[in-house]
Design a protein with these regions (language model features):
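Hydrophobic, proline/glycine-rich low-complexity stretches
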Residues: 1-91, 103
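Membrane-lipid interaction segments
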Residues: 94-95, 107
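Internal, well-folded beta-alpha domain core
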Residues: 108-200
Length: 200
């Protein structure tokens, strides 16, 4: 939603925690897993996080994609991450495209949903298949900040392991997130297991 009046311009500085887009990510490796989704659980997610207010106020309605009732889990390994911005930068420092590289790991779940428009015309012109991400985690803080500030993705910082499993050409992945082991008063924040995957 736009607010009347002048917008505050974004100013890049050498103290920024984000790196300006666009980005170049060569040689990304993806491990993808697909499993049947519980349609009722997907609808509940849509109602809790996407279908806010009344349908008339929103102008749309999210529902599960019943024709393809599956969920996806993806592990991504980015060996090189480079800013490929061609815009001139006047920050008094080396431009980001001329700096070194970084790497990261990323894990997210993906649910295919349908965004239905309102009314007969809306059903034809404003209906689209989209993907929602119930969670997305990354292993590097810069990617976490850029994902939130530049792309609007609620990325969380996590510890992510990716390696070959016990058998040749198998895969093993794990995610650990900050949290509390119990609701007891005084419980100290620690890094807890969140997700483990291993193929045979």
């Amino acid at each position: 939603m736009r607010v009347a009046g002048p917008a505050i311009p974004y100013v890049q500085s050498s103290a920024s925690q984000d790196v300006p887009p666009p980005y170049h990510f060569p040689d990304v490796t993806v491990q993808a897993f697909i499993w049947p989704a519980q349609i009722g659980a997907v609808q509940k997610y849509c109602d809790n996080f996407l279908n806010l207010g009344t349908r008339e106020e929103r102008g749309f309605e999210y529902r599960p994609l019943a024709a393809w009732p599956y969920a996806m889990l993806l592990f991504l390994d980015y060996p090189e991450m480079i800013s490929s911005s061609r815009e001139p930068e006047d920050i008094g420092e080396t431009p980001y495209p001329e700096r070194g590289i970084t790497s990261q790991r990323e894990v997210f779940a993906c649910l295919p949903v349908v965004r239905y428009g309102n009314g007969p015309l809306g059903l034809i012109a404003d209906t689209d298949i989209e993907c929602v991400l119930p969670f997305i985690v990354v292993s590097k803080p810069w990617s976490c900040v850029c994902g939130r500030e530049m792309l609007g993705l609620g990325k969380l910082l996590a510890e992510i392991d990716m390696a070959e499993g016990y058998y040749p050409d198998s895969f093993r992945g794990a995610v650990r997130l900050p949290g509390w082991a119990s609701d007891a008063p005084g419980e100290h924040l620690s890094v807890l297991p969140f997700l483990d995957v291993e193929t045979g």
